[in-house]
Amino acid sequence: MDDDQQFCLRWNNHQSTLISVFDTLLENETLVDCTLAAEGKFLKAHKVVLSACSPYFATLLQEQYDKHPIFILKDVKYQELRAMMDYMYRGEVNISQDQLAALLKAAESLQIKGLSDNRTGGGVAPKPESSGHHRGGKLSGAYTLEQTKRARLATGGAMDTSGDVSGSREGSSSPSRRRRKVRRRSMENDAHDNSNSSVLQAAASNQSILQQTGAGLAVSALVTTQLSSGPAAGTSSQASSTQQQQPLTSTNVTKKTESAKLTSSTAAPASGASASAAVQQAHLHQQQAQTTSDAINTENVQAQSQGGAQGVQGDDEDIDEGSAVGGPNSATGPNPASASASAVHAGVVVKQLASVVDKSSSNHKHKIKDNSVSSVGSEMVIEPKAEYDDDAHDENVEDLTLDEEDMTMEELDQTAGTSQGGEGSSQTYATWQHDRSQDELGLMAQDAQQRDPQDVSTNQTVVLPHYSIYHYYSNIYYLLSHTTIYEADRTVSVSCPGKLNCLPQRNDLQETKSVTVLYTIHFFLYILMIYIFVLCKILPRIVFVWVST
Protein backbone atom coordinates (compact mmCIF):
# COMPACT_ATOMS: atom_id res chain seq x y z
CA MET A 1 0.00 0.00 0.00
CA ASP A 2 2.88 2.23 0.62
CA ASP A 3 3.97 1.80 -2.97
CA ASP A 4 0.61 3.11 -4.27
CA GLN A 5 0.86 6.33 -2.31
CA GLN A 6 1.43 9.34 -4.55
CA PHE A 7 2.54 12.78 -3.76
CA CYS A 8 1.32 15.89 -5.59
CA LEU A 9 4.08 18.31 -6.30
CA ARG A 10 2.74 21.74 -7.23
CA TRP A 11 4.82 24.50 -8.66
CA ASN A 12 3.33 27.62 -7.29
CA ASN A 13 5.05 30.03 -9.71
CA HIS A 14 4.92 27.81 -12.73
CA GLN A 15 3.22 30.21 -15.15
CA SER A 16 5.19 33.24 -14.10
CA THR A 17 8.41 31.25 -14.38
CA LEU A 18 7.60 30.06 -17.86
CA ILE A 19 6.63 33.56 -18.93
CA SER A 20 9.85 34.99 -17.58
CA VAL A 21 11.84 32.24 -19.25
CA PHE A 22 10.19 32.92 -22.60
CA ASP A 23 10.91 36.61 -22.14
CA THR A 24 14.58 35.98 -21.49
CA LEU A 25 14.80 33.56 -24.40
CA LEU A 26 13.24 36.18 -26.70
CA GLU A 27 15.55 38.93 -25.52
CA ASN A 28 18.63 36.75 -25.90
CA GLU A 29 17.31 35.21 -29.15
CA THR A 30 17.96 31.74 -27.76
CA LEU A 31 16.38 28.63 -29.30
CA VAL A 32 14.45 30.74 -31.81
CA ASP A 33 13.14 28.79 -34.79
CA CYS A 34 11.25 31.35 -36.96
CA THR A 35 11.51 34.96 -38.08
CA LEU A 36 8.85 37.62 -38.58
CA ALA A 37 9.58 40.50 -41.00
CA ALA A 38 7.80 43.87 -41.19
CA GLU A 39 8.91 47.10 -42.87
CA GLY A 40 12.29 45.58 -43.65
CA LYS A 41 13.00 44.73 -40.01
CA PHE A 42 13.14 41.27 -38.46
CA LEU A 43 12.02 39.74 -35.18
CA LYS A 44 13.01 36.21 -34.19
CA ALA A 45 10.47 34.15 -32.24
CA HIS A 46 9.56 30.65 -31.11
CA LYS A 47 7.08 28.52 -33.00
CA VAL A 48 5.57 27.15 -29.79
CA VAL A 49 4.67 30.59 -28.45
CA LEU A 50 3.27 31.78 -31.77
CA SER A 51 1.17 28.62 -32.19
CA ALA A 52 -0.15 28.86 -28.64
CA CYS A 53 -1.17 32.50 -28.97
CA SER A 54 -2.53 32.53 -32.54
CA PRO A 55 -4.44 29.87 -34.47
CA TYR A 56 -3.34 31.59 -37.67
CA PHE A 57 0.33 31.01 -36.84
CA ALA A 58 -0.49 27.45 -35.67
CA THR A 59 -1.98 26.44 -39.03
CA LEU A 60 0.73 28.30 -40.90
CA LEU A 61 3.55 26.61 -38.98
CA GLN A 62 2.01 23.19 -39.34
CA GLU A 63 2.25 23.46 -43.10
CA GLN A 64 5.86 24.60 -43.01
CA TYR A 65 8.51 21.93 -42.78
CA ASP A 66 11.51 24.20 -42.78
CA LYS A 67 13.62 24.42 -39.71
CA HIS A 68 13.66 28.22 -39.63
CA PRO A 69 10.93 29.76 -41.81
CA ILE A 70 10.62 33.51 -42.43
CA PHE A 71 7.18 35.13 -42.51
CA ILE A 72 6.82 38.51 -44.20
CA LEU A 73 3.85 40.36 -42.77
CA LYS A 74 2.16 42.81 -45.13
CA ASP A 75 0.28 45.91 -43.94
CA VAL A 76 1.76 45.51 -40.45
CA LYS A 77 4.17 48.02 -38.98
CA TYR A 78 7.26 46.98 -37.09
CA GLN A 79 6.14 48.83 -33.98
CA GLU A 80 2.80 47.02 -34.00
CA LEU A 81 4.55 43.67 -34.50
CA ARG A 82 6.85 44.39 -31.57
CA ALA A 83 3.86 45.25 -29.36
CA MET A 84 2.07 42.01 -30.32
CA MET A 85 5.20 40.00 -29.53
CA ASP A 86 5.41 41.61 -26.08
CA TYR A 87 1.73 40.84 -25.53
CA MET A 88 2.16 37.17 -26.51
CA TYR A 89 5.29 36.62 -24.42
CA ARG A 90 4.38 38.64 -21.30
CA GLY A 91 0.60 38.79 -21.40
CA GLU A 92 0.45 42.61 -21.35
CA VAL A 93 1.71 45.58 -23.28
CA ASN A 94 1.65 49.37 -22.89
CA ILE A 95 0.71 51.40 -25.94
CA SER A 96 -0.43 54.95 -26.61
CA GLN A 97 -3.99 55.80 -27.49
CA ASP A 98 -3.34 56.90 -31.05
CA GLN A 99 -1.73 53.51 -31.86
CA LEU A 100 -4.44 51.40 -30.22
CA ALA A 101 -6.74 51.17 -33.25
CA ALA A 102 -3.94 50.12 -35.61
CA LEU A 103 -2.72 47.51 -33.13
CA LEU A 104 -6.17 45.97 -32.75
CA LYS A 105 -6.58 45.87 -36.52
CA ALA A 106 -3.26 44.07 -36.97
CA ALA A 107 -4.13 41.65 -34.16
CA GLU A 108 -7.44 40.89 -35.90
CA SER A 109 -5.60 40.01 -39.10
CA LEU A 110 -3.14 37.72 -37.26
CA GLN A 111 -5.86 36.28 -34.97
CA ILE A 112 -3.99 36.99 -31.76
CA LYS A 113 -5.89 35.53 -28.82
CA GLY A 114 -7.23 38.18 -26.48
CA LEU A 115 -7.03 40.90 -29.13
CA SER A 116 -9.25 39.44 -31.84
CA ASP A 117 -12.59 37.68 -32.17
CA ASN A 118 -11.07 34.38 -33.30
CA ARG A 119 -9.44 33.67 -29.98
CA THR A 120 -9.61 30.85 -27.47
CA GLY A 121 -8.29 32.84 -24.56
CA GLY A 122 -9.94 35.38 -22.35
CA GLY A 123 -10.91 38.76 -23.63
CA VAL A 124 -9.21 41.96 -22.66
CA ALA A 125 -10.60 45.41 -22.13
CA PRO A 126 -8.28 48.41 -22.53
CA LYS A 127 -7.73 49.87 -19.07
CA PRO A 128 -5.67 52.95 -18.27
CA GLU A 129 -2.64 52.14 -16.16
CA SER A 130 -1.24 54.83 -13.94
CA SER A 131 1.81 52.88 -12.75
CA GLY A 132 3.45 50.41 -15.09
CA HIS A 133 6.56 49.79 -17.12
CA HIS A 134 7.42 48.35 -20.48
CA ARG A 135 10.44 47.97 -22.67
CA GLY A 136 10.08 51.27 -24.47
CA GLY A 137 9.82 53.26 -21.26
CA LYS A 138 6.55 55.03 -22.12
CA LEU A 139 4.54 55.58 -18.96
CA SER A 140 2.13 58.47 -19.63
CA GLY A 141 -1.12 58.03 -21.54
CA ALA A 142 -0.76 54.24 -21.95
CA TYR A 143 -3.31 51.43 -21.98
CA THR A 144 -2.74 47.91 -20.60
CA LEU A 145 -4.08 44.84 -22.36
CA GLU A 146 -4.33 41.91 -19.98
CA GLN A 147 -5.31 38.36 -20.81
CA THR A 148 -8.01 37.91 -18.21
CA LYS A 149 -11.60 36.81 -18.17
CA ARG A 150 -12.79 39.09 -15.41
CA ALA A 151 -13.13 42.14 -17.63
CA ARG A 152 -15.38 40.30 -20.08
CA LEU A 153 -17.49 38.97 -17.23
CA ALA A 154 -17.80 42.49 -15.79
CA THR A 155 -19.03 43.88 -19.14
CA GLY A 156 -21.93 41.43 -19.13
CA GLY A 157 -20.74 38.89 -21.64
CA ALA A 158 -22.09 35.35 -21.21
CA MET A 159 -19.32 32.86 -20.66
CA ASP A 160 -19.57 29.09 -20.58
CA THR A 161 -19.31 27.63 -17.07
CA SER A 162 -17.48 24.62 -18.42
CA GLY A 163 -13.77 24.74 -19.00
CA ASP A 164 -14.25 25.43 -22.72
CA VAL A 165 -13.04 28.94 -23.56
CA SER A 166 -13.23 28.64 -27.33
CA GLY A 167 -16.11 31.11 -27.73
CA SER A 168 -16.22 34.31 -29.67
CA ARG A 169 -15.92 37.73 -28.06
CA GLU A 170 -18.98 38.47 -26.02
CA GLY A 171 -20.16 41.84 -24.80
CA SER A 172 -18.38 45.09 -25.48
CA SER A 173 -15.32 46.67 -24.00
CA SER A 174 -15.88 49.11 -21.18
CA PRO A 175 -15.40 52.75 -22.16
CA SER A 176 -12.36 54.58 -20.98
CA ARG A 177 -12.30 57.14 -18.20
CA ARG A 178 -11.81 59.98 -20.64
CA ARG A 179 -14.98 59.08 -22.50
CA ARG A 180 -16.86 58.93 -19.23
CA LYS A 181 -15.50 62.32 -18.27
CA VAL A 182 -16.51 63.72 -21.65
CA ARG A 183 -20.00 62.33 -21.23
CA ARG A 184 -20.25 63.79 -17.74
CA ARG A 185 -19.09 67.16 -19.02
CA SER A 186 -21.58 67.06 -21.87
CA MET A 187 -24.37 66.18 -19.45
CA GLU A 188 -23.33 69.04 -17.15
CA ASN A 189 -23.21 71.44 -20.12
CA ASP A 190 -26.66 70.29 -21.21
CA ALA A 191 -28.01 70.81 -17.70
CA HIS A 192 -26.39 74.24 -17.56
CA ASP A 193 -27.83 75.18 -20.95
CA ASN A 194 -31.25 73.96 -19.88
CA SER A 195 -31.06 76.01 -16.69
CA ASN A 196 -29.96 79.08 -18.65
CA SER A 197 -32.77 78.62 -21.15
CA SER A 198 -35.28 78.20 -18.33
CA VAL A 199 -34.00 81.38 -16.68
CA LEU A 200 -34.24 83.27 -19.96
CA GLN A 201 -37.76 81.97 -20.57
CA ALA A 202 -38.78 83.01 -17.06
CA ALA A 203 -37.33 86.48 -17.58
CA ALA A 204 -39.11 86.82 -20.93
CA SER A 205 -42.40 85.70 -19.39
CA ASN A 206 -41.96 88.17 -16.52
CA GLN A 207 -41.22 90.95 -18.99
CA SER A 208 -44.30 90.10 -21.06
CA ILE A 209 -46.43 90.02 -17.90
CA LEU A 210 -45.09 93.43 -16.86
CA GLN A 211 -45.81 94.83 -20.32
CA GLN A 212 -49.33 93.43 -20.25
CA THR A 213 -49.97 94.82 -16.78
CA GLY A 214 -48.55 98.23 -17.82
CA ALA A 215 -50.77 98.27 -20.90
CA GLY A 216 -53.77 97.30 -18.78
CA LEU A 217 -53.02 100.08 -16.30
CA ALA A 218 -52.67 102.63 -19.12
CA VAL A 219 -55.96 101.51 -20.65
CA SER A 220 -57.68 101.68 -17.28
CA ALA A 221 -56.29 105.18 -16.69
CA LEU A 222 -57.54 106.32 -20.08
CA VAL A 223 -60.95 104.83 -19.37
CA THR A 224 -61.16 106.52 -15.98
CA THR A 225 -60.14 109.89 -17.42
CA GLN A 226 -62.68 109.55 -20.19
CA LEU A 227 -65.43 108.53 -17.74
CA SER A 228 -64.58 111.23 -15.21
CA SER A 229 -64.18 114.05 -17.74
CA GLY A 230 -67.90 114.64 -18.50
CA PRO A 231 -68.77 118.23 -19.29
CA ALA A 232 -65.32 119.46 -18.30
CA ALA A 233 -63.91 117.69 -21.36
CA GLY A 234 -66.11 119.84 -23.56
CA THR A 235 -64.80 123.00 -21.94
CA SER A 236 -61.19 121.89 -22.31
CA SER A 237 -61.72 121.00 -25.98
CA GLN A 238 -63.46 124.33 -26.52
CA ALA A 239 -60.54 126.14 -24.90
CA SER A 240 -58.03 124.28 -27.05
CA SER A 241 -60.03 124.99 -30.22
CA THR A 242 -60.23 128.69 -29.42
CA GLN A 243 -56.51 128.64 -28.63
CA GLN A 244 -55.79 127.28 -32.11
CA GLN A 245 -58.28 129.53 -33.85
CA GLN A 246 -56.95 132.93 -32.80
CA PRO A 247 -53.97 134.56 -34.59
CA LEU A 248 -50.48 133.94 -33.22
CA THR A 249 -49.37 137.08 -31.40
CA SER A 250 -47.84 137.55 -28.00
CA THR A 251 -50.86 139.37 -26.45
CA ASN A 252 -53.36 136.86 -27.76
CA VAL A 253 -51.21 134.02 -26.50
CA THR A 254 -51.14 135.41 -22.98
CA LYS A 255 -54.90 136.06 -23.04
CA LYS A 256 -55.65 132.57 -24.24
CA THR A 257 -53.37 130.98 -21.68
CA GLU A 258 -55.14 132.91 -18.96
CA SER A 259 -58.51 131.80 -20.32
CA ALA A 260 -57.25 128.21 -20.48
CA LYS A 261 -56.10 128.45 -16.87
CA LEU A 262 -59.52 129.86 -15.87
CA THR A 263 -61.34 127.07 -17.65
CA SER A 264 -59.04 124.51 -16.06
CA SER A 265 -59.63 126.04 -12.61
CA THR A 266 -63.41 125.94 -13.12
CA ALA A 267 -63.26 122.38 -14.37
CA ALA A 268 -61.00 121.22 -11.52
CA PRO A 269 -63.82 120.46 -9.09
CA ALA A 270 -65.49 118.35 -11.80
CA SER A 271 -62.44 116.13 -12.45
CA GLY A 272 -58.73 116.58 -11.68
CA ALA A 273 -57.53 114.48 -14.58
CA SER A 274 -59.33 116.51 -17.27
CA ALA A 275 -58.07 119.78 -15.76
CA SER A 276 -54.45 118.63 -15.79
CA ALA A 277 -54.82 117.47 -19.40
CA ALA A 278 -56.28 120.84 -20.39
CA VAL A 279 -53.43 122.71 -18.68
CA GLN A 280 -50.84 120.58 -20.47
CA GLN A 281 -52.51 121.20 -23.82
CA ALA A 282 -52.61 124.93 -23.08
CA HIS A 283 -48.89 124.97 -22.30
CA LEU A 284 -48.09 123.06 -25.48
CA HIS A 285 -50.16 125.47 -27.57
CA GLN A 286 -48.49 128.39 -25.83
CA GLN A 287 -45.03 127.10 -26.73
CA GLN A 288 -46.05 126.50 -30.34
CA ALA A 289 -47.58 129.96 -30.56
CA GLN A 290 -44.45 131.60 -29.15
CA THR A 291 -42.16 129.82 -31.60
CA THR A 292 -44.32 130.68 -34.60
CA SER A 293 -44.81 134.29 -33.47
CA ASP A 294 -41.05 134.71 -32.99
CA ALA A 295 -40.46 133.29 -36.45
CA ILE A 296 -43.01 135.63 -38.05
CA ASN A 297 -42.52 138.85 -36.07
CA THR A 298 -39.03 139.80 -37.29
CA GLU A 299 -37.51 143.23 -37.52
CA ASN A 300 -37.79 143.34 -41.31
CA VAL A 301 -41.57 142.84 -41.23
CA GLN A 302 -42.60 144.95 -38.22
CA ALA A 303 -42.88 148.27 -40.06
CA GLN A 304 -44.79 146.85 -43.01
CA SER A 305 -47.16 144.44 -41.27
CA GLN A 306 -49.07 147.05 -39.23
CA GLY A 307 -51.96 147.22 -41.69
CA GLY A 308 -52.25 143.46 -41.77
CA ALA A 309 -52.12 143.36 -37.95
CA GLN A 310 -55.01 145.82 -37.77
CA GLY A 311 -57.05 143.59 -40.10
CA VAL A 312 -56.14 140.60 -37.98
CA GLN A 313 -57.26 142.41 -34.83
CA GLY A 314 -60.60 143.16 -36.51
CA ASP A 315 -60.98 139.51 -37.33
CA ASP A 316 -60.05 138.63 -33.75
CA GLU A 317 -62.82 140.84 -32.44
CA ASP A 318 -65.32 139.12 -34.71
CA ILE A 319 -64.06 135.75 -33.58
CA ASP A 320 -64.25 136.76 -29.92
CA GLU A 321 -67.86 137.80 -30.43
CA GLY A 322 -68.65 134.47 -32.09
CA SER A 323 -66.97 132.61 -29.25
CA ALA A 324 -68.88 134.66 -26.68
CA VAL A 325 -72.12 133.80 -28.41
CA GLY A 326 -71.23 130.10 -28.52
CA GLY A 327 -69.83 130.05 -24.97
CA PRO A 328 -72.89 128.72 -23.14
CA ASN A 329 -73.43 126.06 -25.71
CA SER A 330 -69.88 124.88 -25.34
CA ALA A 331 -70.22 124.69 -21.59
CA THR A 332 -73.11 122.29 -21.90
CA GLY A 333 -71.63 120.14 -24.63
CA PRO A 334 -70.26 120.07 -28.17
CA ASN A 335 -71.88 122.44 -30.67
CA PRO A 336 -71.70 121.74 -34.42
CA ALA A 337 -72.12 125.41 -35.28
CA SER A 338 -69.12 126.37 -33.17
CA ALA A 339 -67.09 123.55 -34.70
CA SER A 340 -67.84 124.76 -38.25
CA ALA A 341 -67.06 128.34 -37.25
CA SER A 342 -63.73 127.26 -35.74
CA ALA A 343 -62.83 125.39 -38.94
CA VAL A 344 -63.66 128.43 -41.07
CA HIS A 345 -61.65 130.67 -38.80
CA ALA A 346 -58.71 128.28 -38.94
CA GLY A 347 -58.71 128.60 -42.74
CA VAL A 348 -58.83 132.40 -42.43
CA VAL A 349 -55.89 132.40 -40.03
CA VAL A 350 -53.85 130.22 -42.38
CA LYS A 351 -54.57 132.58 -45.27
CA GLN A 352 -53.56 135.58 -43.16
CA LEU A 353 -50.32 133.94 -42.15
CA ALA A 354 -49.55 133.09 -45.78
CA SER A 355 -50.22 136.68 -46.83
CA VAL A 356 -47.98 138.05 -44.08
CA VAL A 357 -45.15 135.70 -45.07
CA ASP A 358 -45.54 136.66 -48.74
CA LYS A 359 -45.44 140.34 -47.83
CA SER A 360 -42.33 139.86 -45.72
CA SER A 361 -40.55 137.98 -48.50
CA SER A 362 -41.56 140.60 -51.08
CA ASN A 363 -40.42 143.41 -48.80
CA HIS A 364 -37.11 141.64 -48.24
CA LYS A 365 -36.64 141.30 -51.98
CA HIS A 366 -37.48 144.99 -52.45
CA LYS A 367 -34.94 145.92 -49.82
CA ILE A 368 -32.28 143.85 -51.53
CA LYS A 369 -33.08 145.52 -54.84
CA ASP A 370 -32.99 148.97 -53.23
CA ASN A 371 -29.64 148.23 -51.65
CA SER A 372 -28.23 147.00 -54.94
CA VAL A 373 -29.52 150.08 -56.76
CA SER A 374 -28.13 152.39 -54.12
CA SER A 375 -24.77 150.62 -54.27
CA VAL A 376 -24.73 150.96 -58.05
CA GLY A 377 -25.67 154.59 -57.75
CA SER A 378 -22.96 155.16 -55.18
CA GLU A 379 -20.42 153.59 -57.48
CA MET A 380 -21.59 155.78 -60.29
CA VAL A 381 -21.48 158.94 -58.16
CA ILE A 382 -17.89 158.47 -56.92
CA GLU A 383 -16.00 161.75 -57.31
CA PRO A 384 -12.34 162.57 -56.77
CA LYS A 385 -11.39 164.08 -53.46
CA ALA A 386 -10.31 167.63 -53.07
CA GLU A 387 -6.67 166.68 -52.48
CA TYR A 388 -6.49 165.17 -55.98
CA ASP A 389 -8.02 168.22 -57.63
CA ASP A 390 -5.24 169.95 -59.54
CA ASP A 391 -7.33 172.96 -60.49
CA ALA A 392 -8.00 173.97 -56.90
CA HIS A 393 -4.32 174.19 -55.91
CA ASP A 394 -2.69 175.45 -59.07
CA GLU A 395 -2.42 178.95 -57.65
CA ASN A 396 -0.63 177.99 -54.43
CA VAL A 397 1.79 175.40 -55.89
CA GLU A 398 5.24 176.55 -56.88
CA ASP A 399 7.22 174.64 -59.50
CA LEU A 400 10.78 174.26 -58.31
CA THR A 401 11.93 171.82 -60.97
CA LEU A 402 12.26 174.51 -63.60
CA ASP A 403 14.49 176.57 -61.37
CA GLU A 404 16.79 173.60 -60.70
CA GLU A 405 17.05 172.85 -64.41
CA ASP A 406 18.00 176.43 -65.19
CA MET A 407 20.72 176.42 -62.57
CA THR A 408 24.20 175.32 -63.57
CA MET A 409 26.34 172.76 -61.80
CA GLU A 410 28.48 175.44 -60.18
CA GLU A 411 25.45 177.11 -58.69
CA LEU A 412 24.26 173.78 -57.41
CA ASP A 413 27.64 173.13 -55.78
CA GLN A 414 27.50 176.52 -54.14
CA THR A 415 23.97 176.12 -52.92
CA ALA A 416 24.40 172.53 -51.67
CA GLY A 417 25.60 171.78 -48.13
CA THR A 418 25.46 174.12 -45.18
CA SER A 419 24.78 177.83 -45.17
CA GLN A 420 28.51 178.63 -44.91
CA GLY A 421 30.14 179.85 -48.08
CA GLY A 422 33.57 179.53 -49.58
CA GLU A 423 35.80 176.50 -49.54
CA GLY A 424 34.27 175.07 -46.45
CA SER A 425 31.05 174.54 -48.31
CA SER A 426 32.62 172.18 -50.84
CA GLN A 427 34.32 170.14 -48.11
CA THR A 428 31.13 169.79 -46.20
CA TYR A 429 29.36 168.75 -49.39
CA ALA A 430 31.76 165.84 -49.91
CA THR A 431 31.27 164.55 -46.40
CA TRP A 432 27.52 165.01 -46.77
CA GLN A 433 27.48 162.77 -49.85
CA HIS A 434 29.34 160.01 -47.94
CA ASP A 435 26.92 160.22 -45.08
CA ARG A 436 24.13 160.26 -47.59
CA SER A 437 25.15 156.80 -48.89
CA GLN A 438 24.99 155.39 -45.37
CA ASP A 439 21.64 157.04 -44.81
CA GLU A 440 20.33 155.50 -48.05
CA LEU A 441 21.36 152.06 -46.80
CA GLY A 442 19.48 152.57 -43.55
CA LEU A 443 16.46 153.95 -45.39
CA MET A 444 16.39 150.95 -47.68
CA ALA A 445 16.44 148.62 -44.67
CA GLN A 446 13.63 150.57 -43.01
CA ASP A 447 11.59 150.57 -46.19
CA ALA A 448 12.07 146.82 -46.47
CA GLN A 449 10.84 146.37 -42.89
CA GLN A 450 7.83 148.66 -43.34
CA ARG A 451 6.83 147.28 -46.71
CA ASP A 452 3.19 146.64 -47.41
CA PRO A 453 2.29 143.15 -46.08
CA GLN A 454 0.39 142.45 -49.30
CA ASP A 455 3.71 142.19 -51.13
CA VAL A 456 5.13 139.78 -48.55
CA SER A 457 4.80 136.08 -49.33
CA THR A 458 6.77 133.02 -48.48
CA ASN A 459 7.60 132.33 -52.11
CA GLN A 460 8.99 135.81 -52.87
CA THR A 461 12.69 136.33 -53.35
CA VAL A 462 14.19 139.77 -52.74
CA VAL A 463 17.54 140.60 -54.29
CA LEU A 464 19.27 143.52 -52.64
CA PRO A 465 21.21 145.52 -55.26
CA HIS A 466 24.98 146.00 -55.01
CA TYR A 467 25.30 143.79 -51.93
CA SER A 468 26.58 140.29 -51.39
CA ILE A 469 25.40 138.12 -48.50
CA TYR A 470 28.20 135.91 -47.26
CA HIS A 471 26.48 134.48 -44.19
CA TYR A 472 23.28 132.56 -44.79
CA TYR A 473 21.48 130.93 -41.89
CA SER A 474 19.49 127.75 -42.40
CA ASN A 475 17.15 128.51 -39.50
CA ILE A 476 14.44 130.96 -40.47
CA TYR A 477 14.61 132.60 -37.02
CA TYR A 478 18.25 133.61 -37.45
CA LEU A 479 17.61 134.56 -41.05
CA LEU A 480 14.90 137.01 -40.01
CA SER A 481 16.77 138.32 -36.99
CA HIS A 482 20.15 139.16 -38.48
CA THR A 483 21.97 139.06 -41.78
CA THR A 484 25.51 140.36 -42.32
CA ILE A 485 26.13 142.37 -45.48
CA TYR A 486 29.56 143.43 -46.74
CA GLU A 487 30.03 146.36 -49.03
CA ALA A 488 33.25 148.31 -49.77
CA ASP A 489 35.05 146.88 -46.70
CA ARG A 490 32.21 148.04 -44.45
CA THR A 491 30.03 145.78 -42.39
CA VAL A 492 26.38 146.71 -42.03
CA SER A 493 23.76 144.72 -40.09
CA VAL A 494 20.24 144.78 -41.41
CA SER A 495 17.17 142.68 -40.63
CA CYS A 496 15.42 140.88 -43.45
CA PRO A 497 11.83 142.00 -44.06
CA GLY A 498 9.05 139.61 -43.09
CA LYS A 499 9.40 135.92 -44.29
CA LEU A 500 11.57 136.70 -47.35
CA ASN A 501 14.51 134.76 -48.67
CA CYS A 502 17.33 137.25 -49.15
CA LEU A 503 19.64 136.16 -51.95
CA PRO A 504 22.81 137.96 -52.99
CA GLN A 505 23.31 139.62 -56.34
CA ARG A 506 26.58 138.18 -57.58
CA ASN A 507 28.62 138.82 -60.61
CA ASP A 508 27.53 135.61 -62.29
CA LEU A 509 29.35 136.42 -65.50
CA GLN A 510 32.79 136.42 -63.87
CA GLU A 511 32.07 133.28 -61.93
CA THR A 512 30.89 131.43 -65.03
CA LYS A 513 34.04 132.51 -66.86
CA SER A 514 36.27 131.24 -64.09
CA VAL A 515 34.38 127.97 -63.92
CA THR A 516 34.62 127.42 -67.66
CA VAL A 517 38.37 128.12 -67.58
CA LEU A 518 38.84 125.56 -64.83
CA TYR A 519 36.79 122.97 -66.69
CA THR A 520 38.77 123.50 -69.90
CA ILE A 521 42.08 123.15 -68.05
CA HIS A 522 40.96 119.91 -66.45
CA PHE A 523 39.74 118.61 -69.78
CA PHE A 524 43.03 119.28 -71.54
CA LEU A 525 45.00 117.74 -68.70
CA TYR A 526 42.86 114.62 -68.89
CA ILE A 527 43.42 114.33 -72.64
CA LEU A 528 47.16 114.83 -72.18
CA MET A 529 47.29 112.02 -69.65
CA ILE A 530 45.45 109.71 -72.02
CA TYR A 531 47.85 110.60 -74.83
CA ILE A 532 50.90 109.89 -72.69
CA PHE A 533 49.44 106.57 -71.56
CA VAL A 534 48.76 105.50 -75.13
CA LEU A 535 52.27 106.46 -76.22
CA CYS A 536 53.81 104.48 -73.38
CA LYS A 537 51.87 101.40 -74.41
CA ILE A 538 52.27 101.60 -78.16
CA LEU A 539 55.76 103.14 -78.55
CA PRO A 540 57.76 100.02 -77.49
CA ARG A 541 55.93 97.95 -80.05
CA ILE A 542 56.60 100.46 -82.78
CA VAL A 543 60.30 100.53 -81.86
CA PHE A 544 60.46 96.74 -81.81
CA VAL A 545 58.85 96.46 -85.21
CA TRP A 546 61.14 99.08 -86.64
CA VAL A 547 64.22 97.36 -85.28
CA SER A 548 63.13 94.00 -86.59
CA THR A 549 62.62 95.37 -90.05
UniProtKB/Swiss-Prot annotation:
Ranges annotated as biased composition (Low complexity): 162-175, 228-251, 263-293, 329-340
Keyword Disulfide bond: no
GO terms of biological process kind: axon guidance; axon midline choice point recognition; axonogenesis; dendrite morphogenesis; gonad development; larval lymph gland hemopoiesis; larval somatic muscle development; nurse cell apoptotic process
Stretch list, region Disordered: 115-200, 228-340
Pfam families: BTB
CC per GO annotation: nucleoplasm; nucleus
Coiled coil regions, renumbered to chain: none
InterPro entries: BTB/POZ_dom (IPR000210), Dros_DevTransReg (IPR051095), SKP1/BTB/POZ_sf (IPR011333)
Keywords: Developmental protein, Differentiation, Neurogenesis, Nucleus, Transcription, Transcription regulation
CDD domains from the UniProt entry: BTB_POZ_BAB-like (cd18315)
Domain of life of the native organism: Eukaryota
Single Gene Ontology MF annotation: DNA-binding transcription factor activity
Compartments (UniProt record): Nucleus
Domain spans labelled BTB: 32-97
UniProt main location, coarse: nucleus
Tissues in which the UniProt entry reports expression: Mostly neuronal.
Function noted in UniProt: Putative transcription factor required for axon growth and guidance in the central and peripheral nervous systems. Repels CNS axons away from the midline by promoting the expression of the midline repellent sli and its receptor robo.
Protein name as catalogued: Longitudinals lacking protein, isoforms H/M/V
Species assigned in the record: Drosophila melanogaster (Fruit fly)
Gene this protein is translated from: lola
